[in-house]
Curated annotation (Swiss-Prot):
It comes from Haemophilus influenzae (strain PittEE). It comes from the Bacteria. It is an enzyme of class 6 (ligase). This is Glycine--tRNA ligase beta subunit. It is found in: Cytoplasm.
Amino acid sequence: MTTQNFLVEIGTEELPPKALKTLATSFADNVEAELIQAGLSFDKIEWFAAPRRLAVKVLNLATQQPSKEIEKRGPAVSAAFDAEGKPTKAAEGWARGCGITVEQAERIATDKGEWLVHCAKIEGQPTKNLLNDIVANALAKLPIPKPMRWADKTVQFIRPVHTVTMLLGDELIEGEILGVASARTIRGHRFLGEKEFEIQHADQYPQLLREKGSVVADFNERKAEILAKSQAKATALGGVADIEESLLEEVTSLVEYPNVLAAKFEERFLAVPAEALVYTMKGDQKYFPIYDKDGKLLPHFIFVSNINPEDPTAIIEGNEKVVRPRLTDAEFFFKTDLKQKLVDRLPRLETVLFQQQLGTLKDKTDRIEQLAGEIAKQIGADEAKAKRAGLLSKCDLMTNMVFEFTDTQGVMGMHYARHDGEDEEVAVALNEQYMPRFAGDELPKSLVASAVALADKFDTLTGIFGIGQAPKGSADPFALRRAALGALRIIVEKNLPLDLEDLVKKSAALFSDKLTNKNVVADVVDFMLGRFRAWYQDEGIAVDVIQAVLARRPTRPADFDARVRAVSHFRTLDSAEALAAANKRVSNILAKADAAIGEINLTACVEPAEKALAEAVLVLRTEVQPLIAQGDYTAVLDKLANLRAPVDSFFDNVMVNAEDPALRQNRLAILNTLQGLFLQVADISVLQ
């Protein structure tokens, strides 16, 4: 079998940087899927992505599609011929569709009789004849939310397409993709290298593009180069570069030929909280800040240019000039904000609507203050500090800094509170109230901050559910899913003794008559338990384990987590499968019971297996009670796992539905007690 390397490059206008990597990997995945569907073998697929191009290279692609045989089964022989042995219309129609006569058909014997069959051979096509459609289909399936048209084209893509190059080895694959004919011409860097040049062989990519076009097409190569050079620049300046993965990938998507440079800003700006300076450097300018070994911001930053002049002075000075006004604004806002205390901004919260039916931000602040105090009492935090932090929780939204740099909310509240002389725990809580901000983010460190964070999240959840605006589909304008998961993480990971129903009831009471949904408590609790499912599935915990616990609907998150861990452990035991099956059988038997089931009567036991199980469950009922009270569900299930032998013996030797009513009721009582022991932890009958 002969093979060749295949290259396809789509040359475009500047692609959206935050979507570039996803587009490139999806393009490669789609090409791979199309090749597999076509039956074409290959060794490896490589993807390339730069601001003005997407490319895929297939290594050792078979140049010929294999032939294949397909079996077309026709009617049964009994239905294919009439009483005189002549073909029926059904048989003739089938044969005609296969391009044969009925006489040419073969026969195949099965356990359901004899059937007409035709084995047809489909010759494989040369790969080059298939590639245009393969690429077109792969591009059509890209995740493009808002495709665009350009010039007089009728086709749509994420950005205008200027060049298409498809090469199988050295052979140009002719065809048209997105309204552009395939050609050997590819474009180089917009400012460096050759503007256009021809590529003769797929093997020349991406090296030729770098040599002639001054473009590093390999996304990961550019990324690694930017990271290494940025770290080296920071080290030379006596610091460490703050390089977040998301920003690194965005910067990588903005440049074709990275030139990493360092610049500086005036030291006077360091009097402004570092978070505000970093916000504008990262968010607006896509710069990497530099910190010293103690975590203090240095008056330097790193940026990545898309051009590489011999003397970079002009570029460096240009970037310093661009960032200076933004830092000056931050300095002005900070100094202006310090003239008014946070607490004095409370009245202005009355002018800002939180939600039309739920009132203003001042209303929300009042509710957070009260609920944070209640939570603080339950978790052993300082109630007064929690209430004070709740009262001030949204005041920084009224500052100039947060109005201009929205992502600094919370952290600026902390800085302003410190300036105002507020207690340190209160100040820190103003920042940590929003934690966790995203998946994997850190949690509030103090119990005071945890109380405020939980109060804020439960207020939002209860309020929005209370007016019937639960999330639908992917729409979640109030970020309720994030709020629910964040609250669960705080309670579980800090092992807080809190109950969801209790918290929602207390939160709902603070809304007076604003809530219209009478089922708000159950709705919020069910929603949050549903988030548990997503959380544990992300951790790799089996769905049936989660369902086993959900069946009991425990509403204390820390308790819920302990049950999940216990059932997950139980599932690994040798006796788990048999006991799960036995519990399922017990559930079915008890569901058919036609009378109330009483307590076990040991003296009424007749069979040895019956008495053995009765004694075992009664002993275990006593032994597991203190463990249940301690929440040590793993130990409970470890003990109950010892019931496998007496349970198996019971079902092998005892007839539950005995004719004697007293005997039958006692055996049902044994099974009811057995089931009850497991249900104190979870419904293990749902385990698969």
